[in-house]
Amino acid sequence: MAKLGNVEHIEEKVESELQPPHMYKVVLNNDDYTPMDFVVEVLQRFFEKNEQQAVDIMLAIHNQGKGLCGVFPFGIAETKVFQVNQFARENQHPLLCTLEKV
């Protein structure tokens, strides 16, 4: 069996800073057909808003054309957008949920 002579072990330190994930706004957009109570239900069901918060956001959507539901990392934001849009279609509403990079 051969013996290895002096073997140097080189350890390299790699310093990497973890970057926070890019954040995305999840937004509900106004339309002329989705009932206000359905929008409130969506906000409570998918964004854990209490009734007053949901009503306030629903009124912002109605009056300003869109309303902020929350800010999340991309994966969570994308999932919420998908879930809300699917729920709206299942209930025959044209409500549109989108995401915007912060």
From Swiss-Prot:
Pfam families: ClpS (PF02617). GO terms for biological process: protein catabolic process; proteolysis. It comes from the Bacteria. Disulfide bonds: none annotated. Binds to the N-terminal domain of the chaperone ClpA. Involved in the modulation of the specificity of the ClpAP-mediated ATP-dependent protein degradation. Belongs to the ClpS family. This is ATP-dependent Clp protease adapter protein ClpS. It comes from Shewanella frigidimarina (strain NCIMB 400). The gene is clpS.
